[in-house]
Amino acid sequence: MYSLARELLFKLSPETSHELSIDLIGAGGRLGLNGLLTKAPASLPTSVMGLQFANPVGLAAGLDKNGDAIDGFAQLGFGFVEIGTVTPRPQPGNPKPRLFRLPQAEAVINRMGFNNLGVDHLLERVKAAKYQGVLGINIGKNFDTPVERAVDDYLTCLDKVYAHASYVTVNVSSPNTPGLRSLQFGDSLKELLEALRRRQEDLTQEHGKRVPLAIKIAPDMSDEETALVASALLGADMDAVIATNTTLSREGVEGLAHADEAGGLSGSPVRDKSTHIVKVLAGELGGRLPIIAVGGITEGRHAAEKIAAGASLVQIYSGFIYKGPALIREAVDAIAALRK
């Protein structure tokens, strides 16, 4: 059934297809229909960050930037849903076209640029949703906020989403916001993490609950850089790391249509690179910080490979575009088989 829907959607431009898909999934969620469209995955309860997940397979940030289809995605069987990236103020993102399919490689290139309707709009959508499961909210900085003031944007978003999120992801790894990835390293990372940690403590007192903080990192790092990031996360007492965002590499898509477009590459070509980062992180963290793995999961076994590499949870995005809701069940089944 999804193969037919995909064939029709792929006749549209990628961004039009994306918007239509969100509308349809959102409408199906409001009507309670999405659960009828696919066989539900097996129950596989998983505890991470002090949270209880129905299963360890989640929706990665970026598909539902504004929280328009939270109930719809949950009904498809995801064990958790992450929305965003959201910024303090609405922003249009980069000029179109900015989203490209590379179907021969089961890949996507995007240079969206954190297009979103702002954190206040997203919170209205969160409040309207009926979903009671684990909800992650991914936060970023506005395009026109200088990098040296990026901390202010993250704290603004954290203040606003804290009471409504199960966990909050801090996106310092999108390649489509100039200067953003510099926040992953050195004093910039240390200062950001310390500010977030202090604010988390204040908000815990204010709201009477501790909301975990996860940091989302890029795949384009050496083992030494990854080790330094791991050390910084441990030093700041972060709650999780999400590995990884999209890559600037074009390995695996050379010569394909759109391969030379600027932006981050996701899907199958980033799989090995992302899994390697997970392995390095796992070795450095030694179980002291959970890893949420994302990048290139297009078959169930790819999810199991990431768990075997050291992840506690996985997320999918591009694989969902190419394989549809059945991939969720396949990933849950593969992880369940690994645990036996």
From Swiss-Prot:
PROSITE patterns linked? DHODEHASE_1
> Where in or outside the cell?
Cell membrane
Summarize where FMN binds, as residue positions: 61-65, 85, 138, 171, 216, 244, 267, 296, 317-318
- Record: active site: 174 (nucleophile)
**Which InterPro entries does the record cross-reference, listed alphabetically?**
Aldolase_TIM, DHO_dehydrogenase, Dihydroorotate_DH_1_2, Dihydroorotate_DH_2, Dihydroorotate_DH_cat, Dihydroorotate_DH_CS
Details of cofactor binding: Binds 1 FMN per subunit.
Query: This protein's superkingdom?
Result: Bacteria
Q: List GO terms (cellular component aspect).
A: cytoplasm; plasma membrane
For the protein in the UniProt heading, the enzyme class is oxidoreductase
Required co-factors = FMN
This enzyme catalyses: (S)-dihydroorotate + a quinone = orotate + a quinol
Q: Which UniProt keywords apply?
A: Cell membrane, Flavoprotein, FMN, Membrane, Oxidoreductase, Pyrimidine biosynthesis
According to its UniProt entry, one GO biological process term is: 'de novo' UMP biosynthetic process
Q: Which Gene3D superfamilies match?
A: Aldolase class I
What EC number(s) is this enzyme filed under?
1.3.5.2
Which HAMAP family did the record assign?
A: DHO_dh_type2 (MF_00225)
The UniProt family comment states:
Belongs to the dihydroorotate dehydrogenase family. Type 2 subfamily.
Oligomeric state and interaction partners are given as: Monomer.
Q: Which NCBIfam families match?
A: PRK05286.1-1, PRK05286.1-2, PRK05286.1-4, PRK05286.2-5, pyrD_sub2
Q: What is the protein named?
A: Dihydroorotate dehydrogenase (quinone)
